[in-house]
């Protein structure tokens, strides 16, 4: 019997990316359970947040179109918290692998710090599991620059079903055997161009770009409020990075790991006096 795979995301249980991913993984013969936030949780990183009613976290059974045989749950919690709940067998047998996505929008470069999609896999890796974060590059920097982040999300809502989710789902399934041969605690971050699979030039291992696709600026501020805007990053693409690979029509794969001690930093702590000198 194959190992159980948890599929989650940060866009919410009702978005198409998670349905496409669940269908593809199920068809590949894997044991799958889906648990994802009830509502949008983008930018939640690895936060441990939940909405409780009388001390209880709400969990609702859901049915995924095209994957009705997959047990699925909408959960009033962040993606990372959902992973934690799954590890405690809240949704049946604990998973051995966590897939997160398919995110609507690339999680490339510095953006991985804020991503709830990646945050879920970081939580899994910290617990000794392997994880795969999957994102589809559906929002170009130009699109992200035309309005605020909220308006950009509204635009995505209108065009969700027209995206090439199948391309990302298929590549994710093909990466699972590769992931299985990595050390425990490994995360693979997959970013896929929004193209038919025949239009994708291939897979490239890539480093993280020093910046994300878009940057937030202050569009307006006054008494009691600020208004932000999303702008295309003004940096030049560096060869060998994930953003450069996407721009050239490649899907990028970047191995990540959960936070750990930086042994290269030397600290002189002996010179610091902790106790207050006696007067």
For each predicted feature, which ranges?
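A cross-family phosphate/adenosyl-ligand binding-site feature
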Residues: 2-5, 19-89, 93-94
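Short acidic, Gly/Ser-rich segments with clustered Asp/Glu that frequently serve as metal-coordination loops
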Residues: 11-16, 223-224
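Hydrophobic/aromatic ligand-binding patch that stacks against planar heteroaromatic rings
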Residues: 24, 120-125
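Hydrophobic/aromatic beta-strand patches that form the interior of the parallel beta-sheet core
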Residues: 33-35, 73, 99, 130-134, ...
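Short acidic, glycine-rich surface-loop motifs adjacent to enzyme active sites
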Residues: 97-106
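Glycine/threonine-rich flexible loop motifs
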Residues: 106-115
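Glycine-rich phosphate/pyrophosphate-binding loops
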Residues: 125-150
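Electrostatically charged, flexible surface regions
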Residues: 149-279
């Amino acid at each position: 019997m194959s190992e159980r795979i948890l599929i989650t995301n940060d866009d919410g249980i009702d978005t198409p990316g998670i349905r496409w991913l669940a269908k593809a993984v199920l068809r590949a013969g894997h044991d799958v359970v889906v648990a994802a936030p009830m509502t949008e949780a983008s930018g939640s990183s690895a936060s441990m947040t939940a909405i409780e009613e009388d001390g209880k976290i709400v969990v609702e059974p859901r049915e995924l179109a095209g994957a009705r045989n997959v047990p699925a749950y909408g959960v009033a919690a962040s993606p990372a918290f959902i992973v934690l709940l799954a590890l405690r067998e809240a949704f049946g047998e604990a998973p051995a692998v966590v897939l997160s996505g398919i995110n609507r929008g690339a999680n490339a470069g510095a953006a991985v710090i804020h991503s709830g999609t990646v945050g879920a896999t970081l939580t899994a890796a910290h617990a000794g599991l392997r994880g795969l974060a999957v994102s589809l590059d559906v929002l170009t920097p130009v699109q992200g620059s035309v309005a605020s982040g909220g308006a950009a999300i509204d635009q995505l809502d209108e065009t969700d079903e027209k995206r090439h989710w199948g391309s990302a789902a298929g590549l994710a399934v093909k990466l699972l055997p590769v992931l299985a041969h990595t050390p425990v605690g490994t995360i693979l971050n997959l970013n896929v161009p929004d193209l038919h699979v025949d239009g994708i030039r291939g897979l490239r291992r890539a480093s993280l770009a020093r910046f994300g696709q878009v940057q937030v600026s202050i569009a307006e501020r006054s008494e009691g409020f600020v208004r932000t805007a999303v702008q295309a990053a003004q940096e030049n693409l560096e060869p060998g990075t994930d953003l450069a690979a996407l721009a050239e029509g490649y899907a990028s794969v970047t191995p990540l790991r959960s936070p750990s001690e930086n042994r290269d930093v030397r600290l002189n702590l002996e010179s610091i006096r902790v106790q207050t000198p006696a007067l």
